[in-house]
Amino acid sequence: MRHRKSGRQLNRNASHRKAMFKNMANSLFLYKTIRTTLPKAKELRRVVEPLITKAKIDSVANRRNAFSKLRDSAIVAKLFTELAPFYKDRPGGYIRILKAGFRTGDKAAMAIVQLIDLETMTDTTAGTTTS
């Protein structure tokens, strides 16, 4: 019986799941929107939201913790310098999961995962680069 076992297995072993969610989180922070299956998107929320919450407090320990999860120093720097200050007044719910129909090959439920307030984030960053 699987009482009190949280999280989805997704037909993968633990190391594969860890690597997959690391790559998906890196892609989400880099491109601000990704397309994946619905169960993976719902699990990705459990990985990404605590990272953004920790990044709001910029300390060496929090940066090392984020680096241990993401393993990419450029993405960690972007998380702490761009994304975390943008969400500093938001208490949670940093990503949006939109249902995007079904995949053609196997009819798997697809979803679009994007960072909340994406439009205003791109407008503010575009405005600062042109000024």
Swiss-Prot record:
One of its GO terms (molecular function) is structural constituent of ribosome. Gene3D superfamilies: Ribosomal protein L17. GO terms for cellular component: cytosolic large ribosomal subunit. It comes from the Bacteria. Keywords: Ribonucleoprotein, Ribosomal protein. One of its GO terms (biological process) is translation. InterPro entries: Ribosomal_bL17, Ribosomal_bL17_CS, Ribosomal_bL17_sf. Part of the 50S ribosomal subunit. Contacts protein L32. Belongs to the bacterial ribosomal protein bL17 family. This is Large ribosomal subunit protein bL17. It comes from Vesicomyosocius okutanii subsp. Calyptogena okutanii (strain HA).
